Amino acid sequence: MSCRSYRISPGCGVTRNFSSCSAVAPKTGNRCCISAAPFRGVSCYRGLTGFSSRSLCNPSPCGPRMAVGGFRSGSCGRSFGYRSGGVCGPSPPCITTVSVNESLLTPLNLEIDPNAQCVKYEEKEQIKCLNSKFAAFIDKVRFLEQQNKLLETKWQFYQNRKCCESNLEPLFGGYIEALRREAECVEADSGRLAAELNHVQEAMEGYKKKYEEEVALRATAENEFVVLKKDVDCAYLRKSDLEANVEALVEESSFLKRLYEEEVCVLQAHISDTSVIVKMDNSRDLNMDCVVAEIKAQYDDVASRSRAEAESWYRTKCEEMKATVIRHGETLRRTKEEINELNRMIQRLTAEIENAKCQRAKLEAAVAEAEQQGEAALADARCKLAELEGALQKAKQDMACLLKEYQEVMNSKLALDIEIATYRRLLEGEEQRLCEGVGSVNVCVSSSRGGVTCGGLTYGTTPGRQIVSGPSVTGGSITVMAPDSCSPCQPRASSFTCGSSRSVRFA
């Protein structure tokens, strides 16, 4: 491997190095030789020359070759490019004619600027910074594209959600109508229950009036019972008096009978003990026995009549009293039965009143619960409607914010697109200027894949293309493309390593 280095100055106070290198890879395949010699002369230099050559040779018996050369000179500049390469392979190398350019033997007056390296380093740093910014802009564009896709997805989602919410409005309308119908049914039930309650209250008032009437009748019956009891007591007292009178009369009659018998006995004894001869001068003969018998008969008749009258009167009174007692007992029994019936009716009415009160309380509780449920349902429906309206308003606000953000993102994207287009135009202009300022570029394409990076010069690849880029003599970059490419290599100071273990060193 051999290296040669030359220095040229592309402008006032600026120098740039160009090198020549060759690399040979032992891989069998196509041969790739690249030789480039860019030069740009400026009016402020005298006798400024530049030379650069680079060849990459593969020991393959045959392979495609491509050479590109370019030259651009100013008022007092010149350049010269030289490249030679041979086909390498297992056969002996061919001997080629060597030509010598005598102008190369003359000493060069390069007028090297000591600040060229610093300026070159600054240019490299600026290019790196611009590349970093460009990569950041590319990442930002990709991120904004992702955000754009996300916002579009959200937009579609919110549009579909809006449609769903608009479809929910008739559902809520139907739900509200159903609640309204339920409220109307509850109101109708409330009216019906109120009518039933009024009917029950009227029936209860009727039962109450009947109860009051029955209570009044009971009080009247009790008063009559008291009066009858007084009459019965009076009759019982009279009966007792009459019984006492009867006993007294019986005792008196027995006493009189005993008295009469005693008197008769005394008279008989007196008559028997006294023998009186009475001679009366009368024309009639008085028979005392007949008189006594007659008086006795009269007395017995009067006593029997009195006894019969007393007994008949007593029997009559007893019968009357018994009839009165039976009548009053029957009346009392009927009154008791009526009182019992009234008590049973009162109990039944009391139970019915209690049931009516319980039913009324239940109906009032049901009506109150139905009203509360209706009010709660209406309040819930109103709350849900308010929440849905708030959610709809919030969704609209979010949609407006998202639209605003989307507009800002689109504006940022447009600005970035403009910046990218500006950078693209700048890059295209630099490439055009590089194409105008290149002296000679020779490119040999092989089937191997790789990349070369040297200082500000980058040799990169993509599938099917070969790219060589680097700073131009005008301060830009140069890019060369070929139909085939090799895998990229990472830069290491002033050397690089290819994926096929091939290295190129620039002095």
Curated annotation (Swiss-Prot):
Region named Coil 2: 287-430
Highest taxon, organism lineage: Eukaryota
Region (Coil 1A): 124-158
Cross-link (Glycyl lysine isopeptide (Lys-Gly) (interchain with G-Cter in SUMO1)): 229
Chain spans, region Head: 1-123
Residue numbers spanned by region Linker 1: 159-168
Pfam family, one: Filament
Region (Tail): 431-507
Spans annotated as Coil 1B: 169-269
Domain IF rod: 123-434
Keywords: Coiled coil, Intermediate filament, Isopeptide bond, Keratin, Ubl conjugation
Region (Linker 12): 270-286
GO cellular component: a single term: keratin filament
Entries under SUPFAM superfamilies matching the protein: Intermediate filament protein, coiled coil region
Family statement: Belongs to the intermediate filament family.
Subunit structure: Heterotetramer of two type I and two type II keratins.
Miscellaneous comment: There are two types of hair/microfibrillar keratin, I (acidic) and II (neutral to basic).
The protein's name: Keratin, type II cuticular Hb5
Organism: Mus musculus (Mouse)
